[in-house]
């Protein structure tokens, strides 16, 4: 989504504004299976940094604004952080789902919450994965291990895309 360099200081005469909203839970059904890692507090939870309980629901919340000339999407994800490549994944999914919706921009933000599932791959068995990846680099054999959980990240991408589709 390229956005626009045009600055508009007045609404057009026939402008009709619309707003859409949607939200979804980012807590998977199997969250307590010992497979998900808590972001932000590795030293406090060492050596086990797995999610042990859920106090509050993690959510993605989306607002879509339309001024009659195009839609602008704002999605906020309750997570420690979200990488540029992850945002591109979400944008690609939205582009496929909503190709006829005249979306001008898709903006995705993280709340930087320190008590949620790790979306950056830093609060898991990091050194084990680092050692494995160094071995793969030097040997040229095997596959690299991602710090993030690909299954969870796809879940997050799907839920975020779903809220955008619903809000549009």
Where are these regions (language model features)?
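Conserved beta-alpha junction segments in alpha/beta enzyme cores
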Residues: 1-168
């Amino acid at each position: 989504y390229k956005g626009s360099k045009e600055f508009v200081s007045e609404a057009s005469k026939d402008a009709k504004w619309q707003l859409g909203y949607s939200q979804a839970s980012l807590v998977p059904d199997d969250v307590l299976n010992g497979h998900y890692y808590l972001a932000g507090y590795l030293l406090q939870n060492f050596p086990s940094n797995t999610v042990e309980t859920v106090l509050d629901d993690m959510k993605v919340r989306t607002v879509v604004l339309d001024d009659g000339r195009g839609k602008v999407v704002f999605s906020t994800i309750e997570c420690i952080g979200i990488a540029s490549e992850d945002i591109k994944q979400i944008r690609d999914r939205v582009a496929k789902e909503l190709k006829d919706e005249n979306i001008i921009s898709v903006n995705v933000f993280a709340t930087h919450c320190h008590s949620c599932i790790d979306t950056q791959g830093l609060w898991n068995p990091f050194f084990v994965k680092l050692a494995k990846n160094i071995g793969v680099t030097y040997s040229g054999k095997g596959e690299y291990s991602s710090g993030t959980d690909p299954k969870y990240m796809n879940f997050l991408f799907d839920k975020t895309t779903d809220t955008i589709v619903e809000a549009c």
